[in-house]
UniProtKB/Swiss-Prot annotation:
Gene that encodes it: rep
Any matching Pfam family: UvrD_C
Sequence intervals crossing the membrane: none
Protein name per UniProt: ATP-dependent DNA helicase Rep
Function summary: Rep helicase is a single-stranded DNA-dependent ATPase involved in DNA replication; it can initiate unwinding at a nick in the DNA. It binds to the single-stranded DNA and acts in a progressive fashion along the DNA in the 3' to 5' direction.
Top-level taxonomic group: Bacteria
Length: 674
């Protein structure tokens, strides 16, 4: 498939800063991969001097695969394609000395972070989960805005901010003492380092001679600053983004970064991609008219050559049960008549709580479905156990990981033993693992607890020494040495569950072996690099799944971004749901409108909206108004279902069950014939 004129221009412009305004479904990934190929084949760039960054591992993997197909593995070798956080991690790994760190640092995930802050803030904030979550979000926002604990304290307004800034200081000091980083540090530390250290900045500007950034509208303050520091005065970069799809302000994303580009880089070339290869003309007309109600710095209007398409439907339901029943009935009928697959359908909603009633009706009617946001492979307990072992091997200062493994499997090392070990370690300013080797510890600890502890840590020390020479053998010995398979069979609810968990362990070992040994495209990694990469993948892949089964897709509008489906149901189109009540209260309607725009532009062929006349909220019955966004759409292209005679819940249930029973009978008859 040839590039269109806009795509071709975006690929070939390489002489200065470039912003590609890529509308939904306009083929931006093709532009990025073709531009990388053009830089290497047409402009003389070496692959190792080009970096492309995006926001998810899935997007980075897809880009890597496409570039590999276009260029071939040999030509693409050395090319840096990663997420922002992986790029930050690479900078930290190479520049740890300049940051005043040890090379064997660990990464904290959100579970570690919650546990540590809970411990550090005892007596400072009440035992309040909501307040703790607010503290975590505030620390994250401070880091994203490049604020150190001292700067946070200096700018604190009010008592709560002062307490939070103090907690941030305690947290930061503890992280440094344990040689541990959290997710936000992976952007904060490289950015501060490049700001302050001319030599390091120059080294990275020479290393990355052309930078490409995907989903630019999702960047926050620190990410934008990192981009500016990496490109420097040379300003050889391409950023691809869409201000109309900026829906992550609650995560610190700043769509105004697109506007700042033209101020910070006056020579910026703006190229628009407006041809959509996904949706019908009618769907795009609705999206264009809706989003035109938001103010724009860069105007663009999507168009399609895929035909005008089916009218958009609006279904009205009496309440949320009726809404789910109607969507399920419509979906079954459509699936039967059009001989489609279940994975062609998506049900999109504003909040996760809306999915439950849809699950109920899909389940009752034996419709296979999948809710996005399932358990990441790296979040599974067996994987976290093994990664905790490896974290201690590669960073003996990681107390959080040590406490996870010390009794996994059970070793008769009780709380009293661990408390005394903790007191001993604290007075000597050592980690728990390191302190366990102290000669004088035998005076503090005695009996079975001491014997079990020293037996365990000395064995782990042997594995640690083996890991320095033969990491693959060390990991194999570790899994066998703790007899982890027996432990899984003892603690799993069934032998089948234990078998599946052991299969996951073997999968992890297989991936680890590949990464330690390297391949045509990737250099061999050290064990430390492998462990930090896996921990980062866990944090970034929550809810991502590679498996594609024939299932109806249920997901939030936020989770749907970047995806496409032939048939889309946008449910709960009511004031208070979309737009969300908190956004109405905070006058943040523009972002909610962008969210509706994202939902509409997921649909390829048909789009159906649903709304309820009544809903139960917080135990009360409310009568919501139709969403203003429905009223902003071109009414000539909408079919609002005619009002029907009001029937009782019992009559409706009988009628609905009869309708579904007829459809199921038709499907059964069809299966019997085939």
């Amino acid at each position: 498939m040839r590039l269109n004129p806009g795509q071709q221009h975006a690929v070939e412009f390489v002489t200065g800063p470039c912003l590609v305004l890529a509308g939904a479904g306009s083929g931006k990934t093709r532009v990025i991969t073709n531009k990388i190929a053009h830089l290497i084949r047409g402009c003389g760039y070496q692959a190792r001097h080009i970096a492309a960054v995006t926001f998810t591992n899935k997007a980075a993997r897809e880009m890597k695969e496409r570039v590999g197909q276009t260029l071939g593995r040999k030509e693409a070798r050395g090319l840096m394609i990663s997420t922002f956080h992986t790029l930050g991690l690479d900078i930290i790994k190479r520049e740890y000395a300049a940051l005043g760190m040890k090379s064997n640092f660990s990464l904290f995930d959100d579970t570690d972070q919650v546990a540590l802050l809970k411990e550090l803030t005892e007596g400072l904030i009440e035992d309040d989960k909501v307040l703790l979550q607010q503290l975590i979000s505030t620390i994250s926002n401070w880091k994203n805005d490049l604020k150190t604990p001292a700067q946070a304290a200096a700018g604190a307004k009010g008592e709560r901010d002062r307490i939070f800034a103090h907690c941030y200081g305690l947290y930061d000091a503890h992280m440094k003492a344990c040689n541990v980083l959290d997710f936000d540090d992976l952007i904060l530390l490289p950015t501060l380092l490049l700001q302050r250290n001319d030599e390091v900045r120059e080294r990275w500007q020479n290393k990355i001679r052309y930078l490409l950034v995907d989903e630019y509208q999702d960047t926050n303050t620190s990410q934008y600053e990192l981009v500016k520091l990496l490109v420097g005065q040379r300003a050889r970069f391409t950023v691809v983004g869409d201000d109309d799809q900026s829906i992550y302000s609650w995560r610190g994303a700043r769509p105004q970064n697109l506007v700042l580009l033209s101020q910070d880089f006056p020579a910026l070339q703006v190229i628009k991609l407006e041809q959509n290869y996904r949706s019908s003309g009618r769907i795009l007309k609705a999206a264009n008219i809706l989003i035109a109600n938001n103010p724009h710095v860069f105007e663009k209007r999507l168009f399609s050559e895929l035909g005008y398409g089916a009218e958009l439907k609006v279904l009205s339901a009496n309440n949320e049960e009726h809404e789910a029943e109607r969507v399920t009935g419509e979906l079954i009928a459509h699936h039967f008549v059009n001989k489609t697959q279940y994975k062609d359908y998506a049900i999109l909603y504003r909040g996760n709580h809306q999915s439950r009633v849809f699950e109920k009706f899909l389940m009752q009617n034996r419709i296979p479905y999948k809710i996005s946001g399932g358990t990441s492979f790296f979040s599974r307990p067996e994987i976290k156990d093994l990664l905790a072992y490896l974290r201690v091997l590669t960073n003996p200062d990681d107390d959080s990981a040590f406490l996870r493994i010390v009794n996994t499997p059970k070793r008769e090392i009780g709380p009293a033993t661990l408390q005394k070990l903790g007191e001993w370690a604290m007075t000597r300013n050592k980690s728990l693992f390191t302190a366990s080797f102290d000669m004088g510890l035998s005076q503090k600890l005695t009996g079975r607890g001491y014997d079990s502890l020293t037996r365990f840590t000395h064995w782990l020390g042997e594995i640690q020494r083996l890991a320095e020479r033969e990491p693959v053998a060390a990991v194999r010995d570790l899994i066998h040495g703790i007899d982890y398979e027996s432990w899984l069979y003892e603690t799993s609810p069934s032998p089948k569950a234990a078998e599946m968990r052991m299969k996951n362990v073997n999968q992890l070992f297989s991936w680890m072996t590949e990464m330690l040994e390297g391949n045509e495209l990737d250099e061999p990694m050290t064990l430390t690099q492998v462990v930090t990469r896996f921990t980062l993948r866990d944090m970034m892949e929550r809810g991502e799944s590679e498996e594609e089964l024939d299932q109806v897709q249920l997901m939030t509008l936020h989770a749907s971004k970047g995806l496409e489906f032939p048939y889309v149901y946008m449910v709960g189109m009511e004031e208070g749901f979309l737009p969300h009540q908190s956004s109405i209260d905070e006058d943040n309607i523009e972002e909610e409108r962008r969210l509706a725009y994202v939902g509409i532009t997921r649909a390829q062929k048909e789009l159906t909206f649903t709304l309820c006349k009544e809903r139960r909220q917080y135990g009360e019955l409310v009568r919501p108004e139709p969403s203003r966004f429905l009223l902003e759409l071109p009414q000539d292209d909408l079919i609002w279902e005619q009002e029907r005679k009001v029937v009782s819940a019992e009559e409706r249930m009988q009628k609905g069950q009869s309708h579904l029973a007829n459809l199921k009978a038709m499907m059964a008859a069809k299966r019997a014939k085939s």
